[in-house]
Amino acid sequence: MRSLALSLHQKYNHTKMKKYIIDLRVVSLQHFNDKYVLLKLSSDEKLPAMLPGQFVEVRVDGSPNTFLRRPISINLVDYDRNELWLLVAAVGDGTRHLASLHEGDTLNCVLPLGNGFTMPKTPEDKWLLIGGGVGIAPLLYFGQEIVRMGAKPTFLLGARSESDLLELEEFCKLGRVLITTEDGSAGEQGFVTNHS
C-alpha cells in the first residue's frame, strides 16, 4: 500500500502547501511527567494534508506573557479519527499553559508549516531516526509513514533519564528501538549523538 505521506510529499515537493487556521478541540491529555504532555486534538472538519516533519503554530490564549504563537512539531496525524497529536515540553510560560489545558478546551492553530522530511524512495531503504527529549516528537509520524511504505525504521531515542523517555510503546510497534539516557538509568549512558 502506498503511503499517504509519500504521495503528499511527491505532490507538494518544491511547492508551497496551503496553510490553514483552524480550531482544534482537546480530546485528551497524557502527562508523562511534570515536563512533558501529549495533547490529542480533534477537528470537526477534515484535517488538511500534513507531512512528517512539519509543525503547527499554536495560539496560547490566557497566558499573559505569551504574545506569539508557539511552534510545535506534529507528533502524529490520524486522518480516520480526525486527530492531531502534539508532544509539548512545558519549559516556558506558553508551553506550561498548553500543558495545563483540559479536555474540551480549544486551540487555534496555523498548519501545516515547514517542508517536512524526505521520504524513502523504496521500501528497501534503511532508516535510522534519531531524536532526544521533545525532539523525538516528529519521528513517530515519520516512522509510521515509513512503515506504511513497507520499510522498517530503527529509532535511536535519547533522554536525560528513564522518566523522560516518551512514547516508547508507540515507537516499539514500528521498529527496533535503541535507547540512550544521560544518567544511564535506561539503555546506554550518554548523549544520543554518542550512542555506539
Give the role of each language-model region.
Residues 3-4, 44, 134:
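Generic N-terminal simple sequence motifs
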Residues 1-16:
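N-terminal amphipathic/basic-hydrophobic helices that include classical n-h-c signal peptides
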Residues 18-103:
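Ferredoxin-reductase
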Residues 11-13, 35, 190, 194:
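Intrinsically disordered, low-complexity N-terminal regions enriched in serine/proline/glycine
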Residues 13-16, 59, 145-146:
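Generic alpha-helical secondary structure signal
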Residues 93-196:
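FNR/FR-type flavoprotein reductase catalytic core
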Residues 14, 18-21, 156:
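Intrinsically disordered, low-complexity regions
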